[in-house]
């Protein structure tokens, strides 16, 4: 039969598309196609005239049924091309005799399903007779094979149980379960013979090695009668686990011819493929996919197969090796990540690779920090060991070192190291480390869900260090009531008086009608009991009171010893509270702090009765500690014996409880913890009492912060009649700071200032849960009420500084007081803005907010801007230049705000800087453009809805006045001294340009609009209206009336004028001086009442300017006086 052309390029393309196809599949296809291509050589008489009925020279094509694409065409063409590509020896096919379709009538059998024995069919192995071919002439009736090159390797036949021992037979289960290579089998079947079933099952056990290859190809022939009618069977799909082939038994036998057996390349896996069964005439051709264990083949056979398939499998082997390397690499990485997850978060956690690596990084950083702390502690102990003379000194040094206010007092360093590191994100599992301190007995959520710690088991807690549970507040209050009852009713005196008879009862008992000679003696004997009994009773009462006090303060105080179960529970809840505070989960943090107090034996009151008892006890305890009795007894909590270790543990326990109470009080003050004023007062008193009992264990800054928090509670919760207690707590905080270190923390220094102290005690302010948005300061620490009060004080200082300029009081308006007072407030504001607690500070329970401060850039910027404006008004340009860099860098918060006031302030500063700079000879249009932009932002600010803040109105007045002063200064500089002299004699002076007049009128309109709601702006309206008329050259009569309002400020106001003065504020010294200069320089001489009035006005202005401290303006006034005096002298002469 003809072969279809199939080039090498197409084969390469097909191999590229296959990609990861196994080389074993190519080997199977090669074996199948080799047999099909060599069918003419294997069966030379298959299509001859005895079978086909045609002539030998017939060249007609074969029947379509015999050469259907499913059976012959495609496999033959593919096999030929594959053999050409793989370099296999190809047998030349002999001439075929086609079978005519009319005489051959090939019969297509349908596909047979997998065989299952029926009731009438018996499965039994049929031995086949194996005949060796004769060396000479073959016998008639046998099929002679043509000569063809031998295959690369053949297996010698071996008898197998249940199968014919042919090299080309089916691979079955050997005794050793050795898998044989695939081969081809041809069987001839004839009708009339009973069917024979050959059933194989591939098993997986290995024992027997395959037989060595023979040196020459062998032909095994099974003789049988062959029926002349060819039968073509459809391809059957045979499973690997149950291989079944059913053939029709012929009359005498079957003729079988073996093809060359190809070996599998090492490492190839044979894929299961369909069994191709081809029958032509009476011969059945079948191929079976097999699996060969290459590890058990001889080396020389493996080498032969690798040489034959080396060129075809090189690319596949490279890809397979690369994929295997990548797979091993990924498997190794995944195994290490799983191992890392088990070490960091435990075996039951469900995390992805990124989360595992992130947790590992956090845990490594935690361990590094812990190791650094341990190294420092070891170094300190080593130095102490070198300096100490004995072990007792070293132990005492270690005990004294534990008194510092660190975060983990009372727990050994190894306990600190095994605490749970913080998780990476809020959504991470609660069990963040297998080394976290677990609790078997805790019943709450949060960190209690962590697994039990391998370090701290219940059996490892030291039993010799017992935990003192202490007394509840109800028991303490009952004991106090008992003591008070004993002191008031004195039951011991009544008891002694009833038990010992008095003199009257004794005389009555011995009274008789006769005379008693011993009565005087007995009366003298009973007098000593009357004198001795009251001291004994009071002594007994005193002993009873001392015993009750010792029971309350010494033996009733709960003491938590380190390395005990309550201490472990406390530190777990406290660390979890720190994490919750850092994440902003304040409700969960409050819950953890509540559990921490419960672990210390100090549960918070849950009912109204418990709350009342706790509050009364804390009040009594604070009064006793003010008398130093309670503080002295509390210093010996745990026992009256002189045990330094127990005393240090008692102080550390009191310190830990005080810090937790204080943090809960701060959360309540900021609205993060629910409860009324009584609960807050109880928390404040508890924190204060325990902090005083802790002594040196509490740092100075923490104790002062607790005192200030108590003063805040008095200011917030108690009525106004009891607000004097704030002075007491503030003085206690100041004394505590000065007694220990001699300095006050930076965050509390403003409380020691008279202005700050007055604001705290007498100011009308309140702490809000949610900090209000402000344009003049930033929000501080959200859990620190003192930071919010500091923010309110900064805004108060800014308002006071602005009011000193806008509406100075009559007492401070004399001289330079209005400017100096404003600068003093601004300096204090700068110091306070450097001591504001920022949101980035630590949220730890043990951290002191007073010692952790930041900077408020917004308040600092407004203070610098106001100071620059004041320096400009004072004509002190050198001081203003020092603040230019601070004002030019506007904070990012103000740049992003939607309110136009900050932008109006910035552009007003730029415009005034360009117009008031006397070193510039000319002010170009660029300065006017900046001034117009500032005026636009100012008008937008005035048009915005009012916020109700007085700082906004005062700041708007300052900016509007600054723009008008800058425009006036630019107009005055444009005039020469000659033009000023002309103004004295002419009715009109030098007029400003239309652009300047329009801008001035717009700013003046903004000032009038502001004066409608802010009365202090009315004084500036009169003065700037007069300036506008002078710039426009208007009638001087109205100008003189406007200036006269500022010139008559010194006239005494009568009773009727008091109301007018309230409606029209009196002008300040600065306004009076400006009016004098405008009137003397720009009003015509006809409007002056006397010839020498101009010089008198200039002299008065010079004296006022000297008081204000404006040296440059004073120099200008003196020069004008010299010019006027010289002119007068020349005229008079």
UniProtKB/Swiss-Prot annotation:
Organism in which the protein naturally occurs: Cricetulus griseus
Residue stretches of biased makeup (Low complexity): 68-78, 181-191, 203-217, 425-454
One cellular component (GO) term of this entry: endoplasmic reticulum membrane
Ranges in the topological domain labelled Cytoplasmic: 1-476, 557-1133
TM regions (residue ranges): 477-497, 536-556
Alphabetized InterPro entries for the sequence: bHLH_dom, HLH_DNA-bd_sf
Residues in bHLH domain copies: 317-367
One Pfam family here: HLH
UniProt protein name: Sterol regulatory element-binding protein 1
Span of the annotated motif 9aaTAD: 27-35
Taxonomy, superkingdom: Eukaryota
Keyword Membrane: yes
Chain spans, region Disordered: 46-78, 131-219, 415-456
CDD domains: bHLHzip_SREBP1
